[in-house]
Amino acid sequence: MRHQRRIPQLSLPADQRKALLRGLTTQLIREGRVTTTKARAKALRNETERMITLAKDGSLASRRRAIGYVYDKQLVHALFEKAQERYGDREGGYTRIVRTTPRRGDNSEMAIVELV
């Protein structure tokens, strides 16, 4: 049963939502910080933490799962090399969400997601 297992819908069809989160995750891993809406930031946090946990595991199966999700293969290899030394002693909480001023056009709540 899937009680209490809600995923953020983000008002998008499933394929567009997955593509959006994959793109945001790739950009966050590459640049270290991303500015987006607060709802997208909360959804992005889950996916990014999952990728970093896979990188800390370091197994071949984990590497293949990460390559299947992140768009850039070289970025995955770099993440797997650096994750153990950067997040080795940390049990989750690899990202930080900082709220910023609302977007000027539609007044939606904005946030910056950054890697700790």
Curated annotation (Swiss-Prot):
Part of the 50S ribosomal subunit. Contacts protein L32. This is Large ribosomal subunit protein bL17. Keywords: Ribonucleoprotein, Ribosomal protein. NCBIfam families: L17. Pfam families: Ribosomal_L17. It comes from Prochlorococcus marinus (strain NATL2A). Belongs to the bacterial ribosomal protein bL17 family. One of its GO terms (biological process) is translation. The keyword Ligase does not apply. It comes from the Bacteria. GO terms for cellular component: cytosolic large ribosomal subunit. PANTHER family: LARGE RIBOSOMAL SUBUNIT PROTEIN BL17M, RIBOSOMAL PROTEIN L17. GO terms for molecular function: structural constituent of ribosome.
